[in-house]
Amino acid sequence: IILHTYEAYKPDAIFVSTSCVSGVTGEDVDGVAIDLDAELPVPVIPVHCEGFKSRIWASGFDISDHAILQGIVKPPKEKRRFINIKNFYESARPQITKIFNEVFDAEPQFLYCNATIEELSHLSENLATVCICGTLGTYLGNALEETYGVPYVRTINHSGVTGFETWLRGIGDAI
């Protein structure tokens, strides 16, 4: 299936996701990914999401972030005027883009909808990481900060005037 996927679609990366069943049967997804990663010209990245094990739906956010960090993000070469923003379905994209452009002279890098593999490979070069929800972005924010020094903005929820102003100040302080 993986070889067929590559031949048919020529993706820039292939994520091999596990399931409850593969977790129970003990399939060697890592071994398959390692073998095919050596064979194909694109990264083949295992994503472990055996739902029976955790029973916590939000762990899927951390699992996807881990896969991106391990298989796609590259060490920084130079800083870019982008701010990583993880939100649901790129909600409020025009408004966030306008605010980031006008207030911070930076572009938002929305995660993950519509982001390319090339864009994701540069997350370590961006000015900061922000999120609309700690549950959604804590793993990514902490990992980028600890591994590459990209500040993770931790503020109160940006709802309401006080929350929104605190969020903007947190971004400003970080960059």
Each predicted region: which residue ranges?
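An N-terminal assembly and electron-transfer interface module characteristic of large anaerobic redox
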Residues: 1-175
